[in-house]
Amino acid sequence: MGALSLASSTFAQTWIWYPGDYEIWLGNQMNNRRTERGAFFPPFWKTDSHYVVVEFSKQLNLSEPEEIFIAAEGKYNVKLDGKLQFGMPETMTLPAGKHSLNIKVWNQATPPTIYVKGKTVNSDSSWRVTYEDKEWIDESGKASDTSATVYMDAGCWNFDGATQRPSQFTLLREPHQAISKTEQPEGGTLYDFGKETFGYITLKNLSGKGHIAIFYGESPEEAKDKEFCETLDKLFVESGQVTDLAIRSTSPLNDSANEYTLENSKAFRYVYITHEPGVQIGEVSMQYEYLPEEYRGSFRCNDEELNRIWEVSAYTMHLTTREFFIDGIKRDRWVWSGDAIQSYLMNYYLFFDNESVKRTIWLLRGKDPVTSHSNTIMDYTFYWFLSVYDYYMYSGDRHFVNQLYLRMQTMMDYVLGRTNKNGMVEGLSGDWVFVDWADGYLDKKGELSFEQILFCRSLETMALCADLIGDSDGKQKYDKLASALKAKLKPTFWNTQKQAFVHNSVNGRQSDAVTRYANMFSVFFQYLDDKKQAFCPFKRQYPEDYHSLYAFL
């Protein structure tokens, strides 16, 4: 019931849930593990949650009676052809013929999920789900129709056994030993685990009474900098039990080895441990935590340094591929849309793990109502739209687009509601206009050419997705908006003398600054004709390989 195999499903049945709900719930678990020097540090953007009541339904046509097994995470009822069954049946026999099977689950703590197994009746993504069936019963006892109910296809991953409950999912772990242990002249012990890693420190043969301090670092200097290292833990040992002082959690020592593993994971190479004289620590090791992945991409050449760069890059990518694609293992460990879109592109060549891409896209979108940009950052909202475009182009997964489309529409409605009189976006109150961690001053005022180009591509993405799901009115709407915005890009931002897009326009006046951002993406998206591309400063710098560079931005 803990860590599960992540191979593709080979079973007919699987645990199912409302699409996006499990991903949002799981993401909340991960995003709220961040600490700043022992202090809990939750995200500063809106945190959504799962629907607490979900109905699962399936239309059946059975050639013979069939017994089914039912499991659920939550309190549930079962209706067959509109009639409630007694209690919460674990098994029931369905008669032959056409029937409607409905299972409604309530769970306040974790997403409502179900697992149904029979000869032909099995829970999978073909089941329909809703968070409000809108079925009421009038004074005569007649039930209303549910024609106003919005149903979705069920969400699932690969929890294919009855005991593989989604809420119990954890990443895999394996024990790793430090490659060296060095007593320090100023006191304490420095442990080197050989390379950057991620997991949980384990203390063995732990006894006595007193405080233990654990400091983490990418270098010996950082780990030993007790006042300024990014991450640390503090423990108190007494009477065969350990209290983690950061999270106020007390646990007994495990088994005869008097072993204790910290509950909070950390990223590190070096670990520096000090303790009071009354405490004895035997061995220090770690439990390495990871998402198992199949390496589908590889690289090898006659330059060993380049080979090593590839190996380190692939390992780094794997470290940040966890329940979701995260920005980095050390500090934030959050899901940021700008970091995620880069991870998606690298993933398509290294792992081609589409499930992790979809989980991350669901989490970053969250739920309605939309009250801010993704991660509060304007450009990150547009990266979110672009990530859907890229995912479809690499996977051809039309079903995912169909599932996500309503939330794409409401996200774009939010953006369109914040455009100015020119139909362009500019930073408003509450918006973080990010662009880049740039050296020196980077003007964020007015209409930024970079933001308009991302906005235009997002509108084109909406038109593509509308066409994929058969929304002809939507396609016409978004095509018109994209064309109108695209037609304004050159008149507003193109500087003939510089042969480039300038950085921004304030009150209708072009700035003198030329930055790489708009010019790069205009080349990637082929928004410039051949002549302008030839003169574009970015194209001049990368004349041959500019298209391939997009995969690694």
Go through the PLM ranges and name each one:
Residues T320-G328, D368:
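Short amphipathic alpha-helical segments and their helix-coil junctions
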Residues I329-R331, V335:
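Glycine/proline-enriched, intrinsically flexible loops and inter-domain linkers
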Residues V53-E55, G87, Q184-E186, I329, ...:
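Short, solvent-exposed coil/turn segments
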Residues M1-Q13:
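Bacterial Sec-dependent N-terminal signal peptides
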Residues F11-E323, D339, E355-T360, H399, ...:
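Extracellular/oxidizing-compartment recognition motifs
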Residues V335-L553:
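Active-site core of glycosidic bond-cleaving carbohydrate-active enzymes
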Residues A3, K75, Q108, K209-G210, ...:
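Generic hydrophobic alpha-helical segments
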